[in-house]
A protein has these predicted regions:
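Terminal amphipathic helices with adjacent charged low-complexity linkers/tails
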Residues: 98-157
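Short low-complexity stretches enriched in small and charged residues
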Residues: 8-12, 49, 54-56, 142-151, ...
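Non-catalytic terminal/interface segments that mediate subunit docking, oligomerization
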Residues: 149-230
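Short, exposed beta-strand "edge-strand" segments with a Pro/Gly-rich flavor and a Y/T-containing core
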Residues: 72-77, 94-101, 142-151, 194-198
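Conserved catalytic cores of soluble enzyme domains
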Residues: 1-122, 226-230
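Generic, ordered loop/turn and secondary-structure boundary motif
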Residues: 5, 18, 63-65, 70-74, ...
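Gly-rich Lys/Arg/Thr-decorated short loops/hinges at beta-loop-alpha junctions or inter-strand turns
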Residues: 1-5, 71, 134-141, 152, ...
């Protein structure tokens, strides 16, 4: 790459790229980043600034500097997976919204996202309703009599949404908050439901999801079973 003192001339228009991403996001034009390999230095900002980020497991790496530079600067030993691997960004930093198993899975996730983006819940976008695959009466057996006891909110959602299908957002990050896109009676909606004690990461996840729902004009359903805050 270019010498550091010369980067103001080599990458003099790079900031404009980030500005355009922010501007388009504000105008409701989303950006989807799909990372199959290394996104380093300036490229590391792109997934973080995108509305939706998909990282491939055991392949995607997102960091400003790799292990050699970290070793030189701090004398610390770290591998690339710890610094910016897909698993780390999906469970710890929250940069990744979706963790794909492989390239095919990443592209499938991308296709599903494109289908649901910019679909306001009016008659124009209403699809045929379909019944849940699970029996609704089972809801009574899922919710415990002790309201302070945690239960898997996904099992509840599966019993009232169309076809019992949903697209979960940041599945491995802030796991005590469940966020998903789905349909009820043919109408697209988003669901936010806490899945236990609400931690900081859980709150950040919900905030990000609400912002995305506002941009796509998607109504939200909130399901509460808060057992505590941390």
């Amino acid at each position: 790459g270019a010498n550091l003192p010369d980067q103001d001339r080599v990458f003099n228009n790079y900031g404009k790229f980030f500005m355009e991403m922010s501007r388009r996001s504000k105008e409701g034009i989303p950006t989807i980043s799909v990372v199959f390999g290394n996104a380093t230095a300036g490229g590391a900002y792109v997934p973080g600034m995108s509305d939706y980020s998909i990282l491939q497991k055991n392949a995607a790496k997102v960091f400003l500097a790799g292990p050699p530079l970290v070793k030189m600067a701090t004398n610390e030993d770290a591998n690339d997976e710890e610094l910016g691997g897909a698993q780390m960004h999906s469970s710890i930093s929250g940069v990744s919204d979706f963790l794909a198993k492989d390239e095919k899975d990443a592209l499938e996730i991308t296709k599903n996202l494109i289908k649901k983006i910019k679909q306001p819940a009016d008659n124009k976008y209403k699809s045929d309703a379909s019944s849940p695959k699970f029996v609704k009466d089972e809801i009574i057996g899922i919710i415990p009599s002790n309201l302070k006891k945690r239960f898997d909110i996904r099992e509840l959602v599966k019993r009232f949404v169309d076809s019992s299908e949903f697209i979960e957002f940041k599945e491995n990050y802030g796991r005590t908050m469940f966020c998903c896109w789905t349909k009820i009676n043919g109408y697209p909606i988003g669901i936010i439901a806490n899945n236990g004690v609400i931690f900081i990461e859980s709150a950040r996840k919900a905030t990000h999801f609400i912002q995305l729902a506002n941009k796509s004009n998607t109504p939200l359903l909130f399901i509460h079973n808060t057992t505590g805050f941390m």
